[in-house]
């Protein structure tokens, strides 16, 4: 088994990590930063930009720059939270043929897992550049409160990116792993409060020593998969729009370019207000009307921001209360509170958490990196590099089937430790019923229609019998990734039917395979482009050095030699303008061949006359002493 990397696939930022020589290393990307913006841009020429490069061009390309796509993963288009998002993002969210929420870019419909795969590819490449070897296996984190279809969609994204996803792990659990690995032995209970860019999770985790093993057991988890830093940004954007409307009478909501600039400004202002009590947003030329250009200038204080988002922060308290209740633990019994996710840097969030749990949160856990670090530890456990660690996670939501009267009958209750398997016997509702439909549901409501539908399948050819006589055994099996497998068996005939709940990831097996092939083709194109660029650069360098050599040689070069070299130079320059790598390499070789005698002649002459060779070197040394420029600041005395 090769190296297994840990990836935190975040709503706002993503991060990749590896366990190396017993220590967890967060890997810097090509831009030199430890986290990468989860932003993907599709340029008009077909180029795909990921991360900082995508973020930089967002203002000029708002319709084709995608961010916070994780909020759409595994969701239906008609869901209220999706409809709300449609109003707030400059890109187009559309309805897929199967009813899922997809996005449209340059007239092409794309599934969220396909887009998330671009971020995962960037994380994979970051790790490969650092390790100097191919990476094919990963542990990827998801919010603890992600349902089955969202987990399956994340796994699909990994496959499209060329990764074998060895495990899907919950973000708070990963953070607890990162926190607890080096802690003193002994039992203690921690709360992981994870408020990220798009989701909120809270988990109660017990870290214990059992027979010399470091055991991390999740006692309960709760959360909200549509509450995060993006919502805080939206409140600020709305405030700026309202202020501008009051002042100018113009509504910026219909202007994608202005909204993209406002988004960037809101995010920046929010971050600044975590360390300052006031900041100013200044966006010149935000729009224009008949009277000329308009500028947006708004001063905002920390207290104003807090008043705008106070209800969002309060919304995190109910899941905390429910998690404690489900775990059967009083808040006074919590030993440590760990904050994860960039939004937890906000002083109001820290204040509320301290007040609720009655203790200060720990400051020794990096909220942006802890999740990826925990994923890397889990990867090392799966690879066998880390021993004596046992991770016991839970299923976040109740799983069951629809029974007579539209009722949801639970088979696996929420917060059940996984992996787990549970069976229950059901029967028919009508006399001589020859088939039953198994409708699999996930959620906490008693009414089946109020819960998330994960899929349906039929068990047919049941022998005729009075209602209530046939015995249909339904089995639910959740694997370590939290992904559900369902089976139904007629106990009289032994006939059975089973499915892995995966259709709701939004992609069929054929679609996933096609996307994997597309990704491989793109990868091959990228490699060819790099090789072509390298050949062009080599050719350019040779053209430059040869022209310089001919100029330096002067009349020492015969007319015949000069003609041959000039012809080879022209041929190489023409080849460089083309797209044929082999042609460029052939012309490079040709030019090297015809210019070699001149180079040898020059070298021999320098060897015979070292003083002549020293003179240009002295001139170069003098030239090196030249100061490019000196600036003196002139004070403007007005």
UniProtKB/Swiss-Prot annotation:
Task: List the protein's name.
Answer: Chaperone protein DnaK
This protein's record includes keyword Membrane: no
Q: Which domain of life is it from?
A: Bacteria
Q: Which family does it belong to?
A: Belongs to the heat shock protein 70 family.
Pfam families per the UniProt record, alphabetical: HSP70 (PF00012)
Q: What induces it?
A: By stress conditions e.g. heat shock.
InterPro entries for the chain: ATPase_NBD (IPR043129), Chaperone_DnaK (IPR012725), Heat_shock_70_CS (IPR018181), HSP70_C_sf (IPR029048), HSP70_peptide-bd_sf (IPR029047), Hsp_70_fam (IPR013126)
- PROSITE patterns recorded for this chain? HSP70_1, HSP70_2, HSP70_3
Residue numbers spanned by region Disordered: 605-625
Biased amino acid composition, Basic and acidic residues: 616-625
Organism this protein belongs to: Pseudomonas syringae pv. syringae (strain B728a)
Sites where Phosphothreonine occurs are at 199
Swiss-Prot/TrEMBL keywords = ATP-binding, Chaperone, Nucleotide-binding, Phosphoprotein, Stress response
GO terms (molecular function) for this protein are: ATP binding; ATP-dependent protein folding chaperone; unfolded protein binding
Relate the protein's function as given in its record: Acts as a chaperone.
SUPFAM superfamilies listed in its UniProt record: Actin-like ATPase domain (SSF53067), Heat shock protein 70kD (HSP70), C-terminal subdomain (SSF100934), Heat shock protein 70kD (HSP70), peptide-binding domain (SSF100920)
